[in-house]
Amino acid sequence: MATNSEFLIPARADLAAAREEWLKSLKTMRRLSDNTLIAYERDTRQFLQFLTGHLGEPPSLKEIGNLRIADLRSFLANRRNDGAGARTLGRGLAGVRSLLRHLEKRGLVNAAGASAMRAPRQPKSLPKPLTADDARRVVSADGQMAEEPWIAARNAAVLTLLYGCGLRISEALGLSGDALSDPSARSMTITGKGSKTRLVPLLPAVHKAVAQYRALCPFDLSAGQPLFRGAKGGPLHAAIIQREMQKLRAGLGLPDSATPHALRHSFATHLLGRGGDLRTIQELLGHASLSTTQVYTGVDTQRLLEVYDKTHPRA
């Protein structure tokens, strides 16, 4: 019997079923984040749509086995013409390569040449943190733009967690209702990307912001319920916080780079600027590789040179 995926994606039944099996294996065996799974599903769907036009018919496992590097290059060129940047192209190719490797391991195709293609080189861009003063203004409860007091307190609490603990926005919004309920707690355990856990210290300012939100929130914040709620009581979505950050940018005169994630960058950069070591910051951020954390040394050096140029008498 035909499955939904056979109708929803432009592929023959054998390839559609194999792709569905691959997506399930990513979730259960590799435990990738929901965002990565969504991206891989979307990227491989776009790839199959491209192949349908490229080949003149929906591809099957046979066509996948006959793929050449030139076909993948054509796919990337097509995406680039649609406005995709190097980072998007790299992620898209990563999803396609992961699917091809899965099919090879299952003995369904032999696409070793195509699966070995390297991603486009991405230009290295430094994170853009806020200044310490701007970060404090953003997380201040008094500076929030929401009219309802409990929503203003909620926004301040979320933003304080991003800056005060270095959380990803998905990690903050994934907290349970009983999180940070003990005002004497010095730390909490966060489950991040790849289901990896890490210990995050809790500052008094973080406890204070969450406590103010708890006191004003009209919804049940017990264990098993989400800590942060939308206006109607459902789980709070990241888009709401991103929209509030847009209002703060306009109200406080901040640059477009002042996003919720920039608060996490600010957490790392300000720690490094005050003498924090890279290994500790790596653990606090939940980075799997130290090389990911090392980008913040470039930010700190850049700031040091800016201060030097402005203040040194011989500059």
From Swiss-Prot:
Q: Name where it's found.
A: Cytoplasm
The family database entries (Pfam families) matched by this protein are listed as: Phage_int_SAM_1 (PF02899), Phage_integrase (PF00589)
Q: Give all residue intervals belonging to the Tyr recombinase domain.
A: 125-309
State where it is primarily located: cytoplasm
Q: Which residues form the Core-binding (CB) domain?
A: 13-104
Q: Identify the GO cellular component terms for this protein.
A: cytoplasm
Q: Which GO terms describe its biological process?
A: cell division; chromosome segregation; DNA transposition
Does the keyword section mention Membrane?
no
Question: This protein's superkingdom?
Answer: Bacteria
Q: Residues in the active site?
A: R168, K193, H261, R264, H287, Y296
What are the recorded GO MF terms, alphabetically?
A: DNA binding; tyrosine-based site-specific recombinase activity
Query: What are the UniProt keywords, alphabetically?
Result: Cell cycle, Cell division, Chromosome partition, Cytoplasm, DNA integration, DNA recombination, DNA-binding
HAMAP family, alphabetized: Recomb_XerC_XerD (MF_01808)
Q: How does it assemble?
A: Forms a cyclic heterotetrameric complex composed of two molecules of XerC and two molecules of XerD.
Q: Which family does it belong to?
A: Belongs to the 'phage' integrase family. XerC subfamily.
Query: So what does this one do?
Result: Site-specific tyrosine recombinase, which acts by catalyzing the cutting and rejoining of the recombining DNA molecules. The XerC-XerD complex is essential to convert dimers of the bacterial chromosome into monomers to permit their segregation at cell division. It also contributes to the segregational stability of plasmids.
Q: What's the protein name?
A: Tyrosine recombinase XerC
